[in-house]
Amino acid sequence: MERAGPNSVRSQQQRDPDWVEAWLDDHRDFTFSYFIRKATRDMVNAWFSERVHNIPVCKEGIRAHTESCSCSLQQSPHADNTTPGAPARKISASEFDRPLRPIVVKDSEGTVSFLSDSGKKEQMPLTPPRFDSDEGDQCSRLLELVKDISSHLDVTALCHKIFLHIHGLISADRYSLFLVCEDSSKDKFLISRLFDVAEGSTLEEASNNCIRLEWNKGIVGHVAAFGEPLNIKDAYEDPRFNAEVDQITGYKTQSILCMPIKNHREEVVGVAQAINKKSGNGGTFTEKDEKDFAAYLAFCGIVLHNAQLYETSLLENKRNQVLLDLASLIFEEQQSLEVILKKIAATIISFMQVQKCTIFIVDEDCPDSFSRVFHMECEEVGKPSDPLTREQDANKINYMYAQYVKNTMEPLNIPDVTKDKRFPWTNENMGHVNTPCIGSLLCTPIKNGKKNKVIGVCQLVNKMEENTGKIKAFNQNDEQFLEAFVIFCGLGIQNTQMYEAVERAMAKQMVTLEVLSYHASAAEEETRELQALSAAVVPSAQTLKITDFSFSDFELSDLETALCTIRMFTDLNLVQNFQMKHEVLCRWILSVKKNYRKNVAYHNWRHAFNTAQCMFAALKAGKIQNKLTDLETLALLIAALSHDLDHRGVNNSYIQRSEHPLAQLYCHSIMEHHHFDQCLMILNSPGNQILSGLSIDEYKTTLKIIKQAILATDLALYIKRRGEFFELIRKNQFSFEDPLQKELFLAMLMTACDLSAITKPWPIQQRIAELVAAEFFDQGDRERKELNMEPADLMNREKKNKIPSMQVGFIDAICLQLYEALTHVSEDCLPLLDGCRKNRQKWQALAEQQEKMLLNGESSQGKRD
């Protein structure tokens, strides 16, 4: 038996969990680093639920722990592992791994929202104050107060309790607390947070009375302005004292102790006032009272500072939640401008506590006026709106402020419109508006994404006190919030306007398509004539000679070409297999014919018909139909007939150079895409739906093949793809079983049929070449006249003597190798190759003849010289 070596023993120990745990305990730096790098959210949450949630931890302890963790993280070798040049993040994703409240919540009605109910947070009740006079008990009361301060952030409740504590020391009859505030002009004033706190008074009683005092006026205003305490023995002997409050309340003020409350920057944030010393020292406050009052007010300063930070964070959180809700609303509703404006107005009214919200939409056609005005009042929030009532209300709206803001592109904040001299209320500008209805006003422009154009104006009227409902001025916070709010309003309005514009464009398009489809469809008389003729007799394919690769249409009338097309559909079993109605097929054929332009020399109905005839011959005589599905056969014949629909007699290059609107629709194969779109329009026009017998999947498959086949007639795509096909043929690797190879073959077959005029008997080929040249020369003339450019030789009427040599070059570069490859796939398509070779010989002979004539002409000219 072999003995275990030292390495084996060490390996077994390392696999022992107890040994691993002991090692981790001995290497705490590594353990901490490993936990920081590897711990998951679930692990941290489990640790919290097991250890933290059941242990009450004071905030100071948590703060100290956080600071120690921060230090450890900074000292950890893994803490600073950022790549040089990487952007620094203000907040790490790991900071969000601790358990937080859900971002998205549902309200009582089940509606998803970003707004949470912050009023439901549980707080420990404040401990009742103790009024012992013993110094040890005073210390206990201070500790008790510190405990309350550390766990509560309600400034009103805490300051109320502080005053009750103070009462046990200085024994005043009444206490009041005033906080420093700023209006929209940044002018300071004082608002009572607690007023007339007395022994036995409740928090609700003390906080209900709200009084506003002017800065540097009265005793409280003076203390706030200068930051120095005042101890007044007889208030009525001090000229700064305002006796109006006594006259209103019936209370007699005698002695006053008034002290400032400062923050850590020594700025006055509030003023505390004690009135009427109740016992001792002749009813006046002593120096000891001042010291005790100042000591406790230091706690008030801490409370105010913490509470202001907390309230600011709550306000910012609430703001962000409202803005998130508004963003969600904007992206949720984009169909109706009226609906989205109603939701925006309701959100603004509810959050900002205003009486009225009016949103003006600027008229794009007439920038000096508004196209729409949406008005909502606080009573309408949550109720269905009546359009008639809203129109009547719109007549009572004053446009003066909105017009001013639109022109200046700057916000407007008016504390009291009746005192603003910029906008005098006269009969001319007042209209039907009742002046007393408007007190304070805030008006902000709504700009577009580029910030250089006003698309609307948001006007708020009468900000209300939450408790009393009294009208007050809008402050700077309101301005900032509305400024952020209108950014989302602008997005919503722009998105909705774009949606409405798209809807109007789509409606116009539908009407246009309806008109086009009516004019694109064949006339009923012509359809009935073809239907009657084809019902009587349609000659056989042999009689019509449409199975011959040498077929010529020159002797046929347009009606006879339509009969030939019906025969093609019939002999390919397409009518029977896809339940085509005879009337619909006749109308579709004549509609296709109608949508080829008669003023185009070559790319007209006759070219489309000849392409379809060559496709029919390849399928039947070339025996290619046996290797295709019925859907592929159907798609190829439709594509052959439709592949040049609405051809304008110019190529893609001309369309691009002339900056034709078609060039903006497609990035490549411009005309081919247009041909397919026209094909689709006819197939979907009423009375032309020959594919109505197909299932949905069959219909999609057929359209896909039709599109691929029509796009394949772009010679640029043919040149790009032919190398792959020729290589498969050369290596004898082509197979119809491979879907990609089959798709490639269908594309090559479409090109072969499109160019089949080059394979016709010489008299036919020569006549067609003249038609092609006429069309090309017309394009060259347009290039010279409209684009001021010299056309290529192929398009140049002055170079028509080069047609034979150019035809030889075209056959060698484009045609010959294609028909050779097609013959390898189906030997029955050999007539196409033979015809191409014979015509090459003819063109070559003409080219040589032209060259001799040119040489003879030069020789004769030389002899004359």
From Swiss-Prot:
**GO terms, molecular function:** 3',5'-cyclic-GMP phosphodiesterase activity; 3',5'-cyclic-nucleotide phosphodiesterase activity; cGMP binding; cyclic-nucleotide phosphodiesterase activity; metal ion binding
| Listed InterPro entries | GAF (IPR003018), GAF-like_dom_sf (IPR029016), HD/PDEase_dom (IPR003607), PDEase (IPR023088), PDEase_catalytic_dom (IPR002073), PDEase_catalytic_dom_sf (IPR036971), PDEase_CS (IPR023174)
A Pfam family (short name) is PDEase_I
State the pathway, as annotated in the record. Answer: Purine metabolism; 3',5'-cyclic GMP degradation; GMP from 3',5'-cyclic GMP: step 1/1
Kindly list the positions annotated as binding Zn(2+): H607, H643, D644, D754
Please write the reaction equations for the catalytic activity of this protein.
3',5'-cyclic GMP + H2O = GMP + H(+)
Residues of the PDEase domain: 526-850
- Keyword annotations from UniProtKB, A to Z: Allosteric enzyme, cGMP, cGMP-binding, Hydrolase, Magnesium, Metal-binding, Nucleotide-binding, Phosphoprotein, Repeat, Zinc
Looking up PROSITE patterns in the UniProt record yields:
PDEASE_I_1, PDEASE_I_2
Domain GAF: start-end pairs: 154-304, 336-493
Keyword check for Acetylation, yes or no: no
Q: GO biological process annotations for this chain's record?
A: cGMP catabolic process; cGMP metabolic process; negative regulation of cardiac muscle contraction; negative regulation of T cell proliferation; oocyte development; positive regulation of cardiac muscle hypertrophy; positive regulation of G protein-coupled receptor signaling pathway; positive regulation of oocyte development
State the EC number(s).
3.1.4.35
Which protein are we looking at? cGMP-specific 3',5'-cyclic phosphodiesterase
- Organism of origin is Mus musculus (Mouse)
Per UniProt, what is the name of the gene that codes for the protein in this document?
Pde5a
